[in-house]
Amino acid sequence: MVNASGDPVIEAAHIWSDTLTVLKHSASLSPREKGWLEGVVPEGVFGSTIVLCVDNNDTLQAIQGDLNDSLLQALRTVTGENMFPAFKVVPKTEPEPLSEAKPAQPYPSEISPTVAEFGKESYGAKPAAAPREPMPATEPQFPVGQQKMNRDPETHLNKNFTFDSFVPGDSNRFARTVALAVAEGSGQDFNPLCIYGGSGLGKTHLLNAIGNYALVKDPGLKVRYVTSEEFTNEFIDALQNPNQSQGQIAEFNRRYRQVDVLLIDDIQFLGGKEATLDQFFHTFNALHQANKRIVIASDVAPKNLKGFEARLISRFESGLTVDVKPPDLETRIAILRMIASMNGSKIPSDVLDLIAERFTENIRELEGALTRVTAVASLSNQPVTRALAEQTLQDFFTTDVEIKPTDIISQVAKYFHLTFEDLVGKSRTKNVAVPRQIAMYLAREMTSMSLMDIGQVFGGRDHTTVMHACTRISDRMQQKQEIYNYVMELTVRLKQSNTN
């Protein structure tokens, strides 16, 4: 889901991407003025302030001068409220430091316009002047973006997720021990290994750690990490061309049945997808009979998986099933210390205690809260204290209301003077087809549903129809102002209706 994490870095990236698009479509700005905006890099959102980095004072003066009013208006259009930019001058160095840590346009055309939920606290009610000196090199930088982007193109493993960076506690120690045994190749009795638990508790971390460790022990191994949606999409892609499907399916089978270690995440999303499950069943059997290692992660225990045949569930249960639970207080504090240590940040113990006491559900909450506190301290040039943390996090406890696909369909239908049935029905007339595509696009960007699940909501349409709709609207938003405006206004309405 877009902005589901509430992380200030990710929120800033989404907001700036949309703001830049608004400004590029502005007829009142000259090409030169639009050019000044290309080098701006978003750093974070704190209250009603968005921190933007520029690489020289000329750019800063241009944006704070002639472009200031246009920028404020664009931010208001995107977020639905008054936001104020604070600027930092961060000169470019050679070689450039980890460009993936602060992408200029992290999600260019695929992300729909978003409206973040901000607190009332503002850190800088007016556009702030740039600091006279660049921020020190020790400024805390949390690797949220890097973790998402540091993915090996062949194995799909995230190199940042290792056993060394996994903090054990009573809630996950047994799962870690078993995972390490599988990674070492000594856990044949645990094959397959099924790890289950709620979101943000470390399942994905463990899967990647297994793959990374296995490759350290034996670089010649063929390891592949894949989510269930990626597996589904690859299988469907292999079926697309009737003239070549046999060859493509054979290639798909080779790709997965020749691996030594298969790590599949979020297996629950395969539920009810009969053709994909049948393909996975045969892949599973081929690997298991060849004594290859299989590790599966799910949000529920195998016996509770919905839409799976008994024959597949029995195979999952033939190995070992372990769970991960929400971390206890001591483990949460240890996790926060690990995060701070990995980023060279010195955080007082009472601040770590405060965050650990307030955020109890999962690790993502902990990381997001710590990131927000350290970023606000850096921006305001203050030390990290318990008082600052209390103030910063006071609006962090509001739970975002998840937007349902039916809410999106209803809102889009109302906006275009159609009915719910029009959008989920079979009509292909232009006055229905375009709103339907917009609704599919919004469902993809504002919910956590897979393409196939979205298709089911829209009258049982298939994966490719939804994919085409999302691509079509994404492209047309860059070409037609009215399409962009439709998506923007609907996004604002959906956010407002779900927070009232």
UniProtKB/Swiss-Prot annotation:
One of its GO terms (molecular function) is ATP hydrolysis activity. Residues 156-377 are annotated as: Domain III, AAA+ region. InterPro entries: AAA+_ATPase, Chromosome_initiator_DnaA, Chromosome_initiator_DnaA-like, Chromosome_initiator_DnaA_CS, DnaA_C, DnaA_dom, P-loop_NTPase, Trp_repressor/repl_initiator. Belongs to the DnaA family. Pfam families: Bac_DnaA, Bac_DnaA_C. Residues 81-155 are annotated as: Domain II. NCBIfam families: DnaA. ATP binds at residues 200, 202-204. Residues 378-500 are annotated as: Domain IV, binds dsDNA. The keyword Plastid does not apply. This is Chromosomal replication initiator protein DnaA. One of its GO terms (biological process) is DNA replication initiation. It is found in: Cytoplasm. Domain I is involved in oligomerization and binding regulators, domain II is flexibile and of varying length in different bacteria, domain III forms the AAA+ region, while domain IV binds dsDNA. Its main location: cytoplasm. Oligomerizes as a right-handed, spiral filament on DNA at oriC. Residues 1-81 are annotated as: Domain I, interacts with DnaA modulators. Plays an essential role in the initiation and regulation of chromosomal replication. ATP-DnaA binds to the origin of replication (oriC) to initiate formation of the DNA replication initiation complex once per cell cycle. Binds the DnaA box (a 9 base pair repeat at the origin) and separates the double-stranded (ds)DNA. Forms a right-handed helical filament on oriC DNA; dsDNA binds to the exterior of the filament while single-stranded (ss)DNA is stabiized in the filament's interior. Keywords: ATP-binding, Cytoplasm, DNA replication, DNA-binding, Lipid-binding, Nucleotide-binding. One of its GO terms (cellular component) is cytoplasm.
